[in-house]
Swiss-Prot record:
It comes from Shewanella sp. (strain W3-18-1). This is Iron-sulfur cluster assembly protein CyaY. GO terms for molecular function: ferric iron binding; ferrous iron binding. It comes from the Bacteria. HAMAP family: CyaY. The keyword Iron applies. CDD domains: Frataxin (cd00503).
Amino acid sequence: MAMTDTEFHQLADDMFQAIESAIETAIDEQDADVDIDASGNVLQLEFVDGSKIVINKQEPLHEIWVATRFGGYHFGFVEGKWLDGRNGGEFMPFVQDSILRQGGIKLSF
């Protein structure tokens, strides 16, 4: 059964909230230097070196797109998991690794 727009937004919003919460914890515990800007369908993280990770919801496709300084990635919801369309990697471990590589911040979910 196809996912509805409402279901998509709920799943995506839950992930955005988990990322924001983990970053807030990292800021408190690691004195991490990262700015979070959540606006509409976009969650933008800016690091001390000026680089950014942009995570956005693509409602028409029911995908989450992520842009890092290493490339762009598209995640679709498959069998209960957000998976990269190219390599099948899971979203949250990918985000953890990207934030560590790009910003030097270790997140715990």
